[in-house]
C-alpha cells in the first residue's frame, strides 16, 4: 500500500512539470532548466516537500520578483516554509494571490534580473490531508 501511495504521489508531481519548459506571462520570459520536487511521507502522516528550481530569465524578459508555488492541498502553514535563492534566505512568504492552494515568495533585492539565473530551494514541512479521501483496502487472506 505504501508503494501505491508513493506511486500516486510521484505521478502527481511529475504531472506538475509535464507542461512546456518555456513560460511566458505578461512580459515574463524564462525557462526552468532544473525543476525537482522531493516528497517525504513522515511518520505522523504529514508530507514534507523539497523543491529545487533553477530559473533562467530571458535577456528580453522582465525581472522575476515574485514566485507563486502550488501545493497539493491547502492544509499547510506558511510558518513551515523555508526558502532561499542562491543561498540567501527568502523571508517574504505569503499566500499566493494567483494560485489557489499556493504561496508566494517575494524575492525583494534578490530579484532575478533579465539574462540572469537563480536557484531557489524551498522546504515545506507539515503538509496535511494529502491522502484525504484515499480508500485503504486491505486484503482478506
Task: Indicate residue ranges for each PLM-predicted region.
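Lumenal/extracellular ectodomains and adaptor appendage modules
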Residues: 20-141
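Bacterial N-terminal signal peptides that target proteins for export
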Residues: 1-8
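Bacterial N-terminal signal peptides
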Residues: 9-18
